[in-house]
Amino acid sequence: MTNTTTIQFNALLLDIEGTITSISFVKDELFPYAFENVGKYLEEHYDKPATQIIIEDLRRLAEQQLETDADVVKIRERKQECIEDVTKNVRHWIKRDKKLTPMKALQGLIWEEAYQRGYVKGHVYPDVLPILKIIESRQIPIYIYSSGSVHAQKLLFANSVEGDMTKILYGYFDTNIGLKGETSSYTKISEQIGVPEKDILFLTDVEAEAAAASKAGLQTRLVIRPGNATLTQEAKNAYGTIHTLEEIL
């Protein structure tokens, strides 16, 4: 069902991909850019402290993943071998659409360079910014929750096709708070922002995320956008649907 009644909420929590940004932008532009440029980025920035921290995190992650994934390789110590191993693992995880925090951190650094050099601009649907401005004018805080790193989220909104949108966003959450399919993640977000679960509206295109948020006590709406996965009728009935952000006003 499409929402036909006014929704009352005191905080807005937004998914990114498939909700306010097209899936094709992430799938067909951002991910392929990181896939193609991971080795090149490591070659150019290998000795930087931020890169070394992520490499160590990726080394520990590889050790864990090796237990359940035979395609993951152990990351060796020597520079060229290390770059080769990290590149192989990251490309493997991108292909598998893994939501792994250290991998997302490296993607964020790669995308930062792409944004800074003007190679990419963050896609945002045309209905998003006008509605967010109205919501902000009502002194309702707006938060982002995505599996992409907070760093990558900020980059997208600072370098969007609509300009710098970060001034109207109050905060960002990623997998450090918990996975998006886990009810506890939404409880933690409620605690951190100081707004009761029942007063938070969460918008997403993913049924499992809507289910987890709803179980935590949040209000939810499933967002239907071009290219999104087809929703079950059961989920539509349970959570309601919208096609643009105008429908939450």
Swiss-Prot record:
Residues where Mg(2+) binds: D15, E17, D205
Class in the EC hierarchy, top level: hydrolase
Stated name of the protein: Enolase-phosphatase E1
Residues that coordinate or bind substrate: S146, S147, K180
GO CC terms in record: cytoplasm; nucleus
Protein's pathway: Amino-acid biosynthesis; L-methionine biosynthesis via salvage pathway; L-methionine from S-methyl-5-thio-alpha-D-ribose 1-phosphate: step 3/6; Amino-acid biosynthesis; L-methionine biosynthesis via salvage pathway; L-methionine from S-methyl-5-thio-alpha-D-ribose 1-phosphate: step 4/6
InterPro entries noted in UniProt: Enolase-ppase_E1 (IPR023943), ENOPH1_eukaryotes (IPR027511), HAD-like_sf (IPR036412), HAD-SF_hydro_IA (IPR006439), HAD_sf (IPR023214)
Physiological role: Bifunctional enzyme that catalyzes the enolization of 2,3-diketo-5-methylthiopentyl-1-phosphate (DK-MTP-1-P) into the intermediate 2-hydroxy-3-keto-5-methylthiopentenyl-1-phosphate (HK-MTPenyl-1-P), which is then dephosphorylated to form the acireductone 1,2-dihydroxy-3-keto-5-methylthiopentene (DHK-MTPene).
